[in-house]
Regions:
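Transmembrane alpha-helical insertion/packing segments
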Residues: 2-63
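Conserved histidines in hydrophobic membrane contexts and catalytic metal-binding motifs
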Residues: 46, 50, 100, 147
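Juxtamembrane helix-capping/reentrant segments at transmembrane boundaries
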Residues: 47, 77-91
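Membrane-helix interface/capping segments
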Residues: 65-81
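Hydrophobic alpha-helical membrane-insertion segments
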Residues: 91-113
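Juxtamembrane non-transmembrane "cap" segments at the membrane-aqueous interface
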Residues: 108-132
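Hydrophobic alpha-helical transmembrane segments
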Residues: 133-156
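Conserved small/polar residues in nucleotide/adenosyl-binding loops
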Residues: 158-164
Length: 166
């Protein structure tokens, strides 16, 4: 693990943080809009971009996790109580689980879809379905519910933890 005595996160960590945060906000808004639209070509296009940005979030989050595991985070303030430090560490872990779990559940849902619509990231890069997941209406429905509930959990969790300072 790269060691630093800096009281701040690195520029790369900060950039990843804000880039992923903005992408997630866009995904939440886009997800809400597209699920409330009637069937149309525009809805199909929004779904395709939603998948593209979701995979982008997944890849950036995995990179961010590797970066975090190989670069020491700044120490939490000494004024924080031990239980507050534990909560801060658990909160970070929960966010990583959600940043990776939500896109994975979406990718799995698309992979299980009986519609078998191919994914092309930003209309350019073919993206495969997850190997081993076969089309199934019941599995797709379960994964859709998981995807939506994880997103609701992420929004709720953010609202609960945003006022706290770690």
């Amino acid at each position: 693990m790269a060691s630093t005595d800096s009281p701040r996160y690195s520029r790369i960590a900060i950039t990843l943080h804000w880039l992923i945060a903005l992408l997630i906000i866009g995904q939440l808004v886009g997800g809400k809009v597209m699920t409330n639209m009637g069937f149309s070509t525009l809805k199909f296009e929004i779904y395709q971009y939603h998948k593209s940005f979701g995979i982008m979030i997944l890849l950036l989050s995995l990179f961010r996790l590797v970066w975090r595991l190989t670069h020491k985070a700044p120490a939490l303030p000494e004024t924080m109580l031990p239980w507050q430090k534990r909560v801060a560490h658990l909160s970070h872990k929960a966010f990583y689980i959600l940043m990776i779990g939500i896109p994975l559940s979406g990718w799995a849902m698309v992979s299980a879809s009986t519609l078998n619509i191919k994914t092309k990231l930003f209309k350019l890069i073919p993206w495969p379905h997850i190997p081993g997941i076969t089309p199934s209406e019941s599995l797709e429905k379960s994964l859709k519910n998981a995807h939506e509930w994880l997103a609701i959990l992420a929004v709720s969790y953010t609202h609960l933890t945003l006022p706290t300072k770690a």
